[in-house]
């Protein structure tokens, strides 16, 4: 994953960066219900598991927002060209392990799903919560498929932790028959504001409806 250092000297958010950076808990997050009807239907038609499909869509939505690709590195900020993901895999004994997925937007859906399933199986066999590589360029992803929740609080190792975290819960039908699912995004407020969080959800909704970030239907 390639990245470059940002020059914050003349950034309009320089003051905001310094202000939130020194707070004991500088993280901000929102939970929003999103319509996953189309993705659930496609997964059923293709015989795909929903979890890795949703991971891909969430990563695509996040990568379309530059602020979510930024990380605090010491006294500097770096921006990745694109970020990959580390997600939780549930194990048979009720514990969990971590699984890293690489995300290539040019990869076809069938190829991605085959790759993701192979990586998930490998991770479960290893059953480790030790990350394979440097985690700086990753999104941290988890799922709580047993609950349709209203709020989710991500654990953070400290105020310098700047990897965005994404979670979702159980999808269920609303009064219109749409399958709605809570999705939570948490990020470092020194790097990300409400506008950027809103952009993530706009991208996510468009992708879930089969559109790209510009709103045009995908082939």
List each model region and its residues:
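Hydrophobic "lid/gating" helix adjacent to the active-site nucleophile
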Residues: 48-85
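Aromatic-residue-lined binding/catalytic grooves and analogous aromatic/hydrophobic interfacial grooves
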Residues: 3-6, 32, 42-46, 61
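Helical lid/core segments from catalytic subdomains that handle acyl or acyl-like groups
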Residues: 91-149
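Flexible, Gly/Pro-enriched loop and linker segments at secondary-structure and domain junctions
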Residues: 1-31, 51, 136-178
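Short, basic, low-complexity termini and linkers enriched in Ser/Thr/Gly/Pro
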Residues: 212-219
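Active-site-proximal acidic secondary-structure segment that organizes catalysis
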Residues: 160-211
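Short amphipathic C-terminal alpha-helix that caps PH/PH-like domains
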Residues: 58, 113-120, 200-208
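Acyl/amide activation-and-transfer machinery of modular secondary-metabolite enzymes
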Residues: 22-41, 82-107, 180-186
